[in-house]
């Protein structure tokens, strides 16, 4: 008794913990589940506590009822669902081989499954009957590791027999990845027409050009020799040709095909595709399923900008964040002169670069505009703005592109121009009530929102909203902080204002505060601040994440190459793949890029600023920070 009292006194704990977070803790063992499995396996190996016998092909297998019920729906229903097997000591299992049952029980007790070509089919049959998804997945993965052109039809039949949608998808992916080679085999022509039609309609079909799809459609009906010798009849075109996206084919190829066709529905289809190529200015308004890229790679893309090297030079290279490699790659040289701070818009997967700063031989505002088409890796100069706009913002509302205010380096602007892709023309709409430049804009629910910026030497925190239906502007609640040369993004029905700088401290400083505007409440709030300064950043939204690319940090006194990504669901920032150079004034967006671009080595001319060290002298010869007196962030 004395010992018990002494122990109680030694272990006496405070009634009220001194730290408020020390009331209780929950501990979790990472090793417990494996230790439990080892214990159950030891019971099995020792023949202890067995309470059921499975009779499979006339042979007995002892097991633990509770473990079987916990492992799969089949046994759970049998032993815990009120069936007669609940009370039986011996349970007869039908439709499963003894060897497969032993394999499955070994997995249940160890989480390990050994598969081979000799046992995978019977194991799969058993797993489907016993409803064990993990084993089904393992069997499907094993089968896929052995799939080739000779056995793929057999595996398709197996997938259909057991309704294995995941295996069917894996087989489809195999053909999509190897389509050009597979379409030249006899097995290809043995696939059901509906299956081939579905595959040829897929955006995931891996081909280097649309001509390969055209040939693949013909190879389902003709041999390779017949196709190459042009021994085919197209007067009544095969149904599979409906899947060919003729506008994606090169104009020269289409013309040759058109010239050799007799009058037929196919000839009319090819003629329409040729008209698509000839009406280059109208292509964005001629989009449909047959002009859609065969790709599901949405990438963050950046154009132009000024980057820091021994001299301040500009980039004519576009760059994209490769989602497969997690790094930045160059993919096209811009038709536009070396520029920065261009307005950027995406309409029907065409990129528009609007106005901005023409930085060749000093700084001046630009009125010219360009359009990039990733389908054909082609640039096109569209109609110029009616006046020069530098430090502007650009938004897409409906089917129009709006260029809002800015400056021309003589005057601040309040003019707003609207671009109509169907007529390739700009027209003035209602101007802002007052001039502003170095502002930012975004679109939400059919309206355009513009925030902050500068007027003269003053930094602003104003918010304005444009309603295209009434062609009117109205003012909203001011943002929480003055800023300019920032970015805006729309995500999950809210507007985010990110980066920039101001002189509230009496000198230029970065703004780290990130403001969030709710159109529903009409109020501003703050979210997780930026971890570093981003003035003149590129801004792009992909999925539920906002990418902030490069820019200038006035706190550091330099341009930056870092990338920060905001996760709106977690309200936190993380570091992204760093740009290959410190750069500001990058025009960024999200674009669907061709699959071949991501899977092949980069093509095109190198950035002249990198290839020719003397080129810098053609542009500027001032230091990285001293040029700011005349630059965008003056």
Swiss-Prot record:
Subcellular location field: Cytoplasm, Cytosol; Cytoplasm, Cytoskeleton, Microtubule organizing center, Centrosome; Cytoplasm, Cytoskeleton, Spindle; Nucleus
Domain BTB residue range list: 50-117
InterPro entries: BACK, BTB-kelch_protein, BTB/POZ_dom, Kelch-typ_b-propeller, Kelch_1, KLHL22_BACK, SKP1/BTB/POZ_sf
Kelch repeat segments: 299-349, 350-399, 400-446, 448-493, 494-544, 545-593
Location of region: Disordered: 600-634
One cellular component (GO) term of this entry: polar microtubule
Residue list for modification N-acetylalanine: 2
Membrane-traversing stretches: none
Cross-referenced PROSITE patterns: BTB (PS50097)
Lineage top rank: taxon: Eukaryota
Residue(s) carrying Phosphothreonine: 463, 605
Keywords noted in UniProt: Acetylation, Cell cycle, Cell division, Cytoplasm, Cytoskeleton, Kelch repeat, Lysosome, Mitosis, Nucleus, Phosphoprotein, Repeat, Ubl conjugation pathway
Physiological role: Substrate-specific adapter of a BCR (BTB-CUL3-RBX1) E3 ubiquitin ligase complex required for chromosome alignment and localization of PLK1 at kinetochores. The BCR(KLHL22) ubiquitin ligase complex mediates monoubiquitination of PLK1, leading to PLK1 dissociation from phosphoreceptor proteins and subsequent removal from kinetochores, allowing silencing of the spindle assembly checkpoint (SAC) and chromosome segregation. Monoubiquitination of PLK1 does not lead to PLK1 degradation.
Protein name: Kelch-like protein 22
Native source organism of the sequence: Ailuropoda melanoleuca (Giant panda)
Gene: KLHL22
């Amino acid at each position: 008794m004395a010992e018990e009292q002494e122990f109680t006194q030694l272990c006496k704990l405070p009634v009220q913990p001194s730290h408020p977070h020390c009331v209780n803790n929950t501990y979790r063992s990472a090793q417990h589940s494996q230790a439990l499995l080892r214990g159950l396996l030891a019971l099995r190996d020792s023949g202890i506590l067995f309470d059921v016998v499975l009779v499979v092909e006339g042979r007995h297998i002892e097991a633990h009822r509770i473990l079987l019920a916990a492992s799969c729906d089949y046994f759970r229903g049998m032993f815990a669902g009120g069936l007669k097997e609940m009370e039986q000591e011996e349970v007869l299992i039908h439709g499963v081989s003894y060897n497969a049952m032993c394999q499955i029980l070994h997995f249940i007790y160890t989480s390990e499954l050994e598969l081979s070509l000799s046992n995978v089919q019977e194991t799969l049959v058993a797993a489907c009957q016993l409803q064990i998804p993990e084993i089904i997945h393992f069997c499907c993965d094993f089968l896929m590791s052995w799939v080739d052109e000779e056995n793929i039809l057999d595996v398709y039949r197996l997938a259909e027999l057991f309704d294995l949608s995941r295996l069917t998808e894996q087989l489809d992916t195999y053909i999509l990845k190897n389509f050009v080679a597979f379409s030249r085999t006899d097995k290809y022509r043995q696939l059901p027409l509906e299956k081939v039609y579905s595959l040829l309609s897929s955006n995931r079909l891996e081909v280097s050009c649309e001509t390969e799809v055209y040939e693949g459609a013909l190879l389902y009906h003709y041999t390779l020799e017949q196709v190459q010798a042009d021994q085919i009849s197209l007067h009544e075109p095969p149904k599979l040709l409906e899947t060919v996206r003729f506008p994606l084919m090169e104009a020269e190829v289409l013309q040759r095909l058109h010239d050799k066709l007799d009058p037929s529905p196919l000839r009319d289809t090819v003629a329409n595709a040729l008209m698509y190529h000839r009406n280059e200015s109208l292509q964005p308004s001629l989009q449909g399923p047959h002009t859609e890229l065969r790709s599901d790679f949405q990438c963050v893309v950046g154009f132009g900008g000024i980057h820091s090297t021994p001299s301040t030079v500009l980039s004519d290279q576009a760059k994209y964040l490769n989602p497969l490699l997690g790094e930045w790659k160059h993919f096209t040289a811009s038709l536009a002169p070396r520029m920065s701070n261009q307005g950027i818009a995406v309409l029907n997967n065409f990129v528009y670069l609007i106005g901005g700063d023409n930085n060749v031989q000093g700084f001046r505002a630009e009125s010219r505009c360009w359009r990039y088409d990733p389908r054909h890796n082609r640039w096109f100069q569209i109609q110029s703005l009616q006046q020069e706009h530098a430090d502007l913002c650009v938004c897409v509302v409906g089917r129009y592109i709006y260029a809002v205010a800015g400056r021309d380096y003589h005057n601040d602007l309040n003019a707003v121009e609207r671009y109509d892709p169907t007529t390739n023309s700009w027209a003035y709409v209602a101007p802002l009530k007052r001039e502003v430049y170095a502002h930012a804009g975004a679109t939400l629910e059919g309206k355009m929102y513009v925030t902050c910026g500068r007027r003269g030497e003053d930094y602003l925190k104003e918010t304005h909203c444009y309603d295209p239906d009434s062609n009117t502007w109205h003012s909203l609640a001011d943002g929480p902080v003055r800023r300019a040369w920032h970015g805006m993004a729309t995500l999950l029905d809210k507007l985010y204002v990110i980066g920039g700088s101001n002189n509230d401290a009496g000198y230029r400083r970065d703004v780290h505060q990130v403001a969030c505007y709710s159109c529903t409440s009409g109020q501003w709030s703050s979210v997780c601040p930026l971890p570093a300064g981003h003035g003149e950043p590129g801004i792009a939204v992909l999925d539920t994440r906002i990418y902030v690319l490069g820019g200038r940090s006035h706190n550091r006194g330099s341009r930056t190459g870092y990338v920060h990504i905001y996760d709106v669901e977690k309200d936190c920032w993380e570091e992204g793949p760093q740009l290959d150079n410190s750069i500001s004034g990058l025009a960024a967006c999200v674009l669907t890029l061709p699959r071949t671009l991501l899977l092949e080595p980069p093509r095109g001319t190198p950035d002249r600023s990198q290839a020719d060290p003397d080129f810098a002298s053609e542009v500027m010869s001032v230091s990285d920070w001293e040029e700011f007196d005349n630059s965008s962030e003056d």
